[in-house]
């Protein structure tokens, strides 16, 4: 009958789709062609399944061909992707979206994500975080402000450079190992005094002037703006665990080298000889370039 013919056609279409998915699962080359990706696209295959897709700088515009694949990790960094709906329902644990046009993260709901990197995306709504159990969260240069949304996560790495965060209180008692709040309005480090696990801290270009709350911690690396510190500098001088100290304008320094420069007054304007500009022609002052994020 006509109805049976229509049903048969529908069945054939479904089977064709299933066969296509099976082919893609077993053939990374076919998947690359379906995606329209360049040679930068790399895939990890386990058995007959593609389980990881590294599409960084692959020229990708759509993730539709990935629909239905059992992917655990995807890197979409520096691609043209904006729609994540084809990823809904995937068992993703690691998702990198840095420097994409993605704005809506609703398709991530229910995923077992552990690592999520959103640097320089168009995300403004962070309600999707509810119920997530992230261990690594990167929201550099985004309007993220409420740390209460991550309070109950088992985070060990949290990068907030250029975000709207001002208060670190929700992080008190956390198990963070690495925290980056560079170029934020954070001024008080007291909540970190109970974060005994903290090893790497970036507070460069913040409003922090007092380092005394860090007493008792065992930091291994710190990034800071020495010229802004007014109190507690001896707190980190006494920190035997501290191997590297980086400033907002310097490369990595060993702790010993940093203290040599610090004691010479490298970051103390009052100890610098006045410059002779009497004969120098006046030039318009150019605006400073924004500092590149420095992650601990």
Predicted feature residues:
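Concave beta-strand-loop units of leucine-rich repeat
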Residues: 37-61, 70-82, 86-209, 213-281
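Positively charged, low-complexity intrinsically disordered regions
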Residues: 4-5, 15-16, 114, 120, ...
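Pro/Ala/Gly-rich low-complexity, hydrophilic intrinsically disordered segments
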Residues: 1-39, 262-279
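Long, low-complexity, intrinsically disordered segments
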Residues: 281-296
